[in-house]
Amino acid sequence: KGCLTCDSVENVKILGHGMLLEPQQGISVAYSKNVLIDGITVVNSRHYTVSGGQSQGITIKNLKSFSYQGWSDGLDFMSCSDVVIDDVFLRNSDDCIAIYTHRWNYYGDSRNICVLNSTLWADIAHPINIGTHGNTETGDEVLEDIVFRNIDILEHDEDDRDYQGCMTINVGDHNLAQNITFEDIRVEHIQEGQLFHLRVMYNQKYNTGPGRGVKNITFRNISCTGKYINPSLIEGYDKNRKIENVLFENIVLNGKRITSLKELNIDKKDFVEKIRIK
């Protein structure tokens, strides 16, 4: 019943099949390099199962997380780079995986992040959330070169439209999100929510300014068997803060391959350019 903290360290391994039971937070990695977490189970963490802040070279393998309280996210990364997540099971009562730039005392871009071969189950909020928090003082932080591949999403249940989306890129705080791929994703059930949510916005609850834009996004080989899904959303903010160059390739909803935005059930709003379906 305690938190493991890696603060300003290098070349650390946290290994084994032990359990962290009801910690305030599971594992914290801050201002560190080359940290491996492998085999740990975290049960009912009050907040993050694993948080990464302004760190480089984090690898998380074969981790299992179960949580039931609000704010008990799974894996959250703020201003991190060169991150690999492989073979994790996350059943969380908030975002399963969230990727931001600046938050708290962490600053800088988030890039080169790869999530593979994993299972996500979100009680509320998002299975996957990218964007939201950044640095409006500098206005130059970027989230880029991010890949989610071979992922099973078992559930998404969120009643607030602003926080819906199994696969969400929702930039605020002058963030720019680019070069992001979702590939081989299987969504089993959506109790309440959206499949895709791409938005440049100014969330006055969490942001101090709007995002800068979203571009070069690929959704490939995505299937969903959920029957009661709210329309997905694609929405820019203004002519200088757009969503552009988004590819939907081989999207299958309830056994039918999608050939149009209408079939994809997407609400395409203003300041959106170059949306393609293959």
What would you call each of these model-derived segments?
Residues K1-K278:
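Extracellular/periplasmic carbohydrate-active domains that bind, remodel
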